[in-house]
UniProtKB/Swiss-Prot annotation:
Signal peptide: none annotated. Residues 1-16 have a biased composition (Low complexity). It comes from the Eukaryota. Residues 1-23, 50-91, 140-161 are annotated as: Disordered. This is Putative uncharacterized protein PAK6-AS1. It comes from Homo sapiens.
Amino acid sequence: MPRAGRAPAEGGPAPGTRSSRCLRPRPLAWRRLVPNFGAWAPRKGAARVGRPVLSPRTSGAAGEPTCGAGSPGTLEEGVASGRTRRRTQSAGEVAKCRWGLGQEPLCPRGAVLLNSFSPPAWPQFPPALRLRALAWPQPRGPACGSTAQWPPRGDPTWRIS
């Protein structure tokens, strides 16, 4: 007869033993993910004791965005600081930002990013040629989708904000 805690010879867990997965404690990260875990987690056969405490909404109705949700004439904290883009900006509207008119550049060198295509997107090139194509100097010009100049004119310390 096999000893308790050992799997029988033909494989599978021994009868009457728990798998080691059930015995392992939950990692510490679990507690960080669930803030007041012990208070409201459902236990077997017991009703929930308490609910997680949600912070009450400070301003605006339910479901309404709180940041940058004012009408275009009003100044709110996020909009007034100039650091954030307005959420209420319509599709045709051009924002004035650090680079001039238009949005901040997505690819600073001004070319279409070839890296963004997954390998199956270019089946016609073998991998070696693909890398050679990426190594060619990309044409310089205005940033993608923007009317601003690249590199930006003015203070060279523009990166430090």
